[in-house]
Amino acid sequence: MTVIAVIDYDMGNLHSACKGLENAGAQTVVSDRPEDLFAADAVVLPGVGAFDPAMQHLRSRQLVPVIHDLIASGKPFLGICLGLQILFEHSEEGQEPGLGILAGTVKRFDPEPGLTIPHMGWNQLDLTQPGLPLWQQLELRPWLYFVHSYYVEPADLEVQAATITHGSQTVTAAIARNNLVAVQFHPEKSADAGLQILANFVSQIKAPVLV
């Protein structure tokens, strides 16, 4: 059975992410031990909360270089919600530097009349990399579940894999580059479409992406 390591760094309840991956046919191991992360077939970086505490927790566990090495090794890697945002260089939300694996920043939604911030609830993805294996067997504009006040703004739009529109603002909702994929929505809370995405990720592990 495919083993997926879920990085434990005290940022959110990991149970729902693990349950979603297990429903997709994987075995999960929750750990912050580098040996467990490298031994797994793939790694998931989840996260709920604020940018600065997330980075502080990763640094306190000496996990920043480990995450860099995991991604550089070609191991399939999925970031979810805050796990997408901290892949970038910095955030308007705080002062801590991010992982810097992707160039760009994390920005807050601009206020608009009638616009709810945080963006909380269901929204439709527009797939900017429609051929991405992560999107297989999805509807053309699938509905996914979001809870966020901030969004990523990649310096290189070629990594953008999907967008959403909230009010008048169209922003990046997913990125993909080689073995690295990350999403702003919560697939584990997104009903059938979310479970399909997790199943697609598990399937990719069995057919690795060449870097």
Curated annotation (Swiss-Prot):
It catalyses: 5-[(5-phospho-1-deoxy-D-ribulos-1-ylimino)methylamino]-1-(5-phospho-beta-D-ribosyl)imidazole-4-carboxamide + L-glutamine = D-erythro-1-(imidazol-4-yl)glycerol 3-phosphate + 5-amino-1-(5-phospho-beta-D-ribosyl)imidazole-4-carboxamide + L-glutamate + H(+); L-glutamine + H2O = L-glutamate + NH4(+). Its main location: cytoplasm. It is found in: Cytoplasm. GO terms for biological process: L-histidine biosynthetic process. GO terms for cellular component: cytoplasm. The keyword Amino-acid biosynthesis applies. IGPS catalyzes the conversion of PRFAR and glutamine to IGP, AICAR and glutamate. The HisH subunit catalyzes the hydrolysis of glutamine to glutamate and ammonia as part of the synthesis of IGP and AICAR. The resulting ammonia molecule is channeled to the active site of HisF. This is Imidazole glycerol phosphate synthase subunit HisH. It comes from Cyanothece sp. (strain PCC 7425 / ATCC 29141). The lineage of its organism: Bacteria, Bacillati, Cyanobacteriota, Cyanophyceae, Gomontiellales. The gene is hisH.
